[in-house]
């Protein structure tokens, strides 16, 4: 008899039980791993699968996490073969060419479209009922690409969008007011990145509108220069890339925040990228961030934001910029 047989006596033969809330992370780069660790530490799933084309890096990252199994409740698996991702509830796509210092998110686009042509069909093959969450940049265009390539209904394809931009915005407003970001209610909508739209008209603390107190807030004529905060939000990622070479932790936490709302069916409102055709005067088939309700079925509802004419105009301009790039893509 083996040591195992001497130690343990079987009472019954177990039937294999599938995971109820499996999450897959595609791409084990900086963002993928920050997303993975954030999901693990929030204890959001009973199985986490990781997949990447770089076999050694993938194997190393999976082993490193598995060595911490004692401190976790999640089974961790990884393989370059997409069968490892089978029956996922949520699939987070972080894979793609990395943004270089000074490179705009839109510049990355065709490089990443070609990568998606391999990734998306594989995800669909093994998890036909999953919710697809796109994080790779430029996120709004690549969410559109994932939607087109997957054939999924729009409520099951979500871009991480301006969830992080809004978090940066709330952090910086909190710094200026000496308040915790959770008490500063503020939204950034539109494109994730350079042409994002800060909704100054909606910024409030405890229901008190800041623009009600300072009607010039967010404009050139504002003596307190609140507008600089939005510039800091836009420049924030570039600054971090300049200093440490890439962004990872905040986007990882943002991804886990979105995954939690889906897995736990929280019906929480997040600014995420969805098909906005027909909203706020947008005519083209583009994905942009607006406040959306996330739950177990994916994106269940969109909140109708009251935007000022100037804010709506900026949103439409964002849509035109994205459509200009999208219509040139070869899918």
UniProtKB/Swiss-Prot annotation:
Keywords: Cytoplasm, NAD, Oxidoreductase. The active site is at residue 192. SUPFAM superfamilies: LDH C-terminal domain-like (SSF56327), NAD(P)-binding Rossmann-fold domains (SSF51735). It catalyses: (S)-lactate + NAD(+) = pyruvate + NADH + H(+). One of its GO terms (molecular function) is L-lactate dehydrogenase activity. Its main location: cytoplasm. InterPro entries: L-lactate/malate_DH (IPR001557), L-lactate_DH (IPR011304), L-lactate_DH_AS (IPR018177), Lactate/malate_DH_C (IPR022383), Lactate/malate_DH_N (IPR001236), Lactate_DH/Glyco_Ohase_4_C (IPR015955), NAD(P)-bd_dom_sf (IPR036291). Belongs to the LDH/MDH superfamily. LDH family. Interconverts simultaneously and stereospecifically pyruvate and lactate with concomitant interconversion of NADH and NAD(+). HAMAP family: Lactate_dehydrog. This is L-lactate dehydrogenase A chain.
């Amino acid at each position: 008899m083996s040591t195992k047989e001497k130690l343990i006596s079987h009472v019954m033969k177990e039937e294999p039980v599938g995971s109820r809330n499996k999450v897959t992370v595609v791409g084990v780069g900086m963002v993928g791993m920050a997303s993975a660790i954030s999901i693990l530490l929030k204890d959001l799933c009973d199985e986490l699968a990781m997949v990447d084309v770089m076999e050694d890096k993938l194997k190393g990252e999976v082993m490193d996490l598995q060595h911490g199994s004692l401190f976790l409740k999640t089974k961790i698996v990884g393989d370059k073969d997409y069968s490892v991702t089978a029956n996922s509830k949520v699939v987070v796509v972080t894979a793609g060419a990395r943004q270089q210092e000074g490179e705009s998110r839109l510049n990355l686009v065709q490089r990443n479209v070609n990568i998606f042509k391999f990734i998306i069909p594989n995800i669909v093959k093994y998890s036909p009922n999953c919710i697809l969450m796109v994080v790779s940049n430029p996120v709004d265009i690549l969410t559109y690409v994932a939607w087109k390539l997957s054939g999924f209904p729009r409520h099951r394809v979500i871009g991480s969008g301006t969830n992080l931009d809004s978090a940066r915005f709330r952090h910086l407003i909190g710094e200026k007011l000496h308040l915790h970001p959770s008490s500063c209610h503020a939204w950034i909508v539109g494109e994730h990145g350079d042409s994002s739209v800060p909704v100054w008209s909606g910024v409030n603390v405890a229901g008190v509108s800041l623009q009600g107190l300072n009607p010039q807030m967010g404009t050139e004529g504002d003596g307190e220069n609140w507008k600089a905060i939005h510039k800091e939000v836009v420049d924030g990622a570039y600054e971090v890339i300049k200093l440490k070479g890439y962004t990872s932790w905040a986007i990882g936490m943002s991804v886990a925040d979105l995954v939690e709302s889906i897995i736990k069916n929280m019906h929480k409102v997040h600014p995420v990228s969805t098909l906005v055709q027909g909203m706020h005067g947008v005519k083209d088939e583009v994905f942009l961030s607006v406040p959306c309700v996330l739950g177990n079925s994916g994106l269940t509802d969109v909140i109708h934001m009251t935007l000022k004419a100037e804010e709506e105009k900026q949103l439409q301009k964002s849509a035109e910029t994205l459509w200009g790039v999208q219509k040139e893509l070869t899918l």
